[in-house]
Amino acid sequence: MEGKEEDVRLGANRYTERQPIGTAAQGAEEKDYREPPAAPVFEVEELTSWSFYRAGIAEFVATFLFLYISILTVMGVNKSASKCATVGIQGIAWSFGGMIFALVYCTAGISGGHINPAVTFGLFLARKLSLTRAVFYMAMQCLGAICGAGVVKGFQRGLYMGSGGGANAVNPGYTKGDGLGAEIVGTFVLVYTVFSATDAKRNARDSHVPILAPLPIGFAVFLVHLATIPITGTGINPARSLGAAIVYNRAHAWHDHWIFWVGPFIGAALAAIYHVVVIRAIPFKSRD
């Protein structure tokens, strides 16, 4: 283990970049920039590092808090006879987006601030983190989501069950294809924003980019929720959908559950391919 290297930017990969920032970077030649090495597929060495487990715990806690706050907000809207008396769809969208903004800001320096298996999957496909770390993150995210939804149910069981438990489903008037398409496009928007906000080359050139990264990510979540809540209740996060479905545990929560895994993973894969092949053109760059 390489000792005390705990820089977890770019998906919590220990392979770091040392690049100039601010005006120094702006004056540097393009050729001075070097692509960071790709993360290995398997990195058994990580299993002996405390920073690896610390990052997983951070993902668990962040996803726990995300489900706790967001589902409570959904319940507050659903229990009211008049949506005018509540925060409404806009408030739900702000709750989800605002929590992602806050939690990414808090955990980015520890785990990379994924809080979403689709984000982790996209970063893995782009070789920003190892399979070992990706699987561990996804497991901790799902466990955190289940616990977050479970605590809400424990506090207000009657209201929780009566308001649908925040579980995702394709709403009446829409087909399964509509729901799948909404999840694919919505997750593409999110993961594409994550790649852009954490792009190493932009971070090297502009010193303000790493500081502001949580803002566009949270705002992307907000906008996607505004657009797709009427269609699927907005998943774009398999852990969020799984946690609510397991704790609510009613038949309709499982009917379309596959959509909330397949859609986000396809969207994340498309975003990763677009970033690597088109935006960064990494396969076409000279190996010299």
Swiss-Prot record:
Ranges that cross the membrane: 57-77, 92-114, 135-155, 177-197, 211-231, 259-279
Position of sequence motif NPA 1: 116-118
Principal location: membrane
Reported induction: By water deficit in upland rice. Expression decreased by water deficit in lowland rice. Circadian-regulation. Expression is higher during the light phase than during the dark phase.
Protein family membership: Belongs to the MIP/aquaporin (TC 1.A.8) family. PIP (TC 1.A.8.11) subfamily.
GO cellular component, one term: plasma membrane
Annotated GO biological process: response to water deprivation
Membrane topology value: Multi-pass membrane protein
MF-aspect GO terms: water channel activity
Motif annotated as NPA 2, chain positions: 237-239
Stretch forming the signal peptide: none
Keyword annotations of the record: Cell membrane, Membrane, Repeat, Stress response, Transmembrane, Transmembrane helix, Transport
Tissue: Expressed in roots and leaves.
Task of the protein: Water channel required to facilitate the transport of water across cell membrane. Increases the capacity for root water uptake under water deficit. May play a role in drought avoidance in upland rice.
Domain-related comment: Aquaporins contain two tandem repeats each containing three membrane-spanning domains and a pore-forming loop with the signature motif Asn-Pro-Ala (NPA).
Name of protein: Aquaporin PIP 1-3
Species lineage: Eukaryota, Viridiplantae, Streptophyta, Embryophyta, Tracheophyta
Region (Disordered), start-end ranges: 1-30
Location of this chain's protein in the cell: Cell membrane
